Amino acid sequence: EIIEIDFILIGMDVVSLEKVAKIAVYVPPNTLPWDDAVQLALDYVEIPYDKVWDEEVLQGKLKDYDWLHLHHEDFTGQYGKFFAAYGSSPWYLMQKQTNENMASKLGYSKVSQLKLAVVRKLRDYVNGGGFMFTMCSGTTTPDIALASQYTDICDVMYDGDPADPNANDKLDYSECMVFQNFKILQNPYVYEYSDIDITDQELMTGQYNDYFTLFDFSAKIDPVPSMLTQCHTAAVKGYLGQESGFREEFIKPSMTILAKNNGTDWVRYIHGNLGRGTFTLYGGYDPEDYQ
């Protein structure tokens, strides 16, 4: 009886897993096996999954899956903002050509237009009951694409014409799923999409001081956040990515914050609901490699 009372007071609960989730990973066709930590993890533990990319998404094939994973994808049409450092590298040029070919094949004059169409399908997928888990640049760039759909944030090296210098005045945050009131960093030579990200601040903290705390939730009241924060430790070692985390002031109040760096406004883990579905954002690239 004492154990039963404690069980109730602590807020524990039992959740039945009624079916095996069918998983899709959004990944470009030229991605190497070691480029995506998620694929490595799924392969290692032998969890089956399918790969999908833009064509499959626009064909409506996401409805066949329960769980969609996005990793370090750029949905703004700026190819990861790698131009300054890698603009002449063969892998960058191949990535650019692959995306341009797909845009042309599917009837879009710009890659940014293709990616916006894909993001709308991702939003529809969640709204219809799917679960989407995103990491790294896959966290913020969908909302940046949605907010900037009525202007042009891509400079000439990305789509052949200049960006709108007043793009930040034309952002529509009502289109966004997670973020609001952010500003886009339009300099194509700066490896950063917007002021949402915390990477520059985090670098000043240093690897050995970077820990974030997973929040506690009652499994009886909040079963999904409770499942998402199950871990052997409440203090998790931080790590970087193109998008390492999110400044709290830019997160919509309807979101559930799952983890933060103590004493800061650095949010590392977010969960939200949309329609019949849910989505989760986790900052950083590879937990086993700080930088």
Language-model features, listed with the residues they occupy:
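Helical hinge/lid and interdomain linker segments adjacent to catalytic or ligand-binding clefts
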Residues: 24, 28-139, 145
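Flexible, charged surface loops at secondary-structure boundaries
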Residues: 17-19, 60-65, 249-252, 273-274
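Catalytic beta-strand/loop cores that center a nucleophilic Ser/Cys/Thr
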Residues: 36, 43, 140, 159-160, ...
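Catalytic cores of eukaryotic secretory-pathway lumenal/extracellular enzymes that build
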Residues: 92, 107-108, 115, 147-150, ...
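Alpha-helical scaffolding within the catalytic cores
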Residues: 7-11, 55-57, 264-268
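Short, flexible, glycine/charge-rich loop motifs used to bind or transfer phosphoryl groups or to couple energy/partner
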Residues: 13-14, 57-59, 115, 245-248, ...
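Hydrophobic targeting/anchoring helices
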Residues: 1-36, 45, 283-284
